[in-house]
Curated annotation (Swiss-Prot):
It holds the Pfam family Trigger_C. This is Trigger factor. Residues 161-246 form the PPIase FKBP-type domain. Its EC number is 5.2.1.8. The gene is tig. Its main location: cytoplasm. Gene3D superfamilies: 3.10.50.40, Trigger factor ribosome-binding domain, Trigger factor, C-terminal domain. GO terms for cellular component: cytoplasm. It comes from Teredinibacter turnerae (strain ATCC 39867 / T7901). It is found in: Cytoplasm. Consists of 3 domains; the N-terminus binds the ribosome, the middle domain has PPIase activity, while the C-terminus has intrinsic chaperone activity on its own.
Length: 441
């Protein structure tokens, strides 16, 4: 086998491979002879079909099979010979495939980049913490109440937090416009789901009232023709629903698994759950800072094939949320690559950099961390042990957890080298979701 390789640009490589004709011919003949033992052709007994007839009938098809198998096998032999790591599948361009002649093809592909890690001692991390106060617990209890609340019609004026059922008709310069009318529309006041001023104009109205409100469409409104336009909406309120919170009693506590101990025990459980949530948030934010520091200090070329693969994985993950309804959708149009590209590039860059950290510092996945992560995931299920057993019996799931454990060990390693500053903030600030990062490497 003859092999030559050249760099075309950046991470792209062009591999030219030549395979002697006799290798192909010998394999074709071998497969045809094997087929002749079992093939059935009218006029011949099984196993007695002349080789010439078998070759005439099946030769071309078998040759194409052999070519495909040989090209695939020879490609991976060639990249091992040249000590390159393909990132993604190659594009194969046949150059010479005629029978009786040496086979030649060109494989174009990207390789994994060389990652030169910068020193990791200058990383600065802020580790936030918070004391969970009675006020924090009160707020969480109210949130739990709201999750169990009911809605009842009220006769008073509407206020923020109420739900109203309305008809509206909008006009600009006295003329109605597309999308400016609705009947029986339900709206939660204060939700911010309508243009600025709309909900505020309705606040204070009672069921049965009709009145006009004046608003201005935002400069960046999604309908271009309506941007910056002044409009008048005639609003009719049909119903105002006020939220009714459930009482804090034994029945309410039981819904959260507290069947004895009353309010004191319930608040203890709430605080315990808040503490767990806080620790998860602290851990996640420290990890996010470490990963950001890795990205900022290490630049890496990204193979387009890896980024595209990550885009596909992210799209598939989102598709699963649609369930059966996704089958008839044009997902490429609904979920275009650009929607995922920045985040996919970030994930790909981090994967390459973290992999290099693992290699350089010989980081190993800790079995205790793997067990801890599995137990944490299983703790929310009715039968945690059944879930734990399932994880350990599923190679793919276990591999995913081991990868996460490896990442945790990398974070631990970098924290040992980093300058860590502790800071106390409010509970809400600690658990506040992080802004998604999408820096390009």
């Amino acid at each position: 086998m003859q092999v030559s390789i050249e760099t075309t640009s950046g991470l792209e490589r062009r591999l030219t491979v030549g395979i002697p004709a006799e290798i192909i011919d010998q394999e074709v003949e071998k497969r045809l002879k094997q087929a002749a033992k079992t093939v059935r052709i009218n006029g011949f007994r099984k196993g007695k079909v002349p080789f010439k007839v078998v070759k005439q009938r099946f030769g071309e098809g078998v040759r194409q099979e052999v070519l495909g198998d040989t090209i695939q096998r020879s490609f991976y032999d060639a990249v091992r010979q040249e000590s390159v790591r393909p990132a993604g599948q190659p594009s194969i361009e046949p150059k010479q495939m005629d029978e009786g002649k040496d086979v030649e093809y060109i494989a174009t592909f990207e390789v994994y980049p060389e990652v030169e890690l910068k020193e990791l001692d200058n990383i600065e991390i802020t580790r936030y913490d918070a004391e969970i106060t009675d006020a924090d617990i009160d707020k969480m209890v109210e949130t739990l109440q709201k999750g169990q609340s009911s809605w009842e019609p009220v006769k008073r004026k509407s206020k923020k937090g109420d739900k109203v059922t309305i008809d509206f008709l909008g006009k600009i310069d006295g003329e109605a416009f597309d999308g400016g009318e609705a009947k029986g529309h339900q709206l939660e006041l204060g939700s911010g789901s309508m243009i600025p001023g709309f909900e505020k104009g309705i606040t204070g109205m009672k069921a049965g009232e009709t009145q006009p409100i004046n608003v201005t469409f935002p400069d960046d409104y999604h309908v271009e023709d309506l941007r910056s336009k002044d409009a008048e909406f005639e609003i009719t309120v049909h119903e105002v629903l006020g939220e009714k919170l459930p009482k804090l009693d034994e029945e309410f506590y039981a819904k959260f698994g507290v069947t004895e101990g009353g309010e004191e025990k319930f608040r203890e459980e709430v605080k315990s759950n808040m503490e767990r949530e806080k620790q998860r948030a602290i851990k996640a934010k420290v990890k996010e800072q470490v990963m950001n520091a890795l990205l900022e200090s290490n630049s890496v070329d990204l193979p387009a094939a890896l980024v595209q693969s990550e885009i596909g994985a992210m799209r598939q993950q989102m598709v699963q949320q649609y369930g059966q309804s996704a089958q008839n959708l044009d997902l490429q149009a609904l979920l275009p690559d650009d929607m995922f590209k920045a985040q996919a590039e970030r994930r790909t860059a981090l994967a390459l950099i973290v992999s290099e950290v693992v290699k350089k510092y010989e980081v190993k996945a800790d079995k205790d961390i793997v067990r801890s992560l599995i137990e944490e995931a299983a703790s929310t299920y009715e039968d945690p042990q059944e879930v734990i057993n399932y994880y350990y019996s599923n190679e793919q799931l276990l591999a995913n957890v081991e990868a996460a454990a490896l990442e945790e060990k990398v974070v631990e390693l970098l924290l040992e080298k980093a300058t860590v500053t502790d800071a106390t903030v409010s509970y809400d600030e600690v658990i506040k979701p992080q802004e998604p990062q999408a820096e390009e490497a």
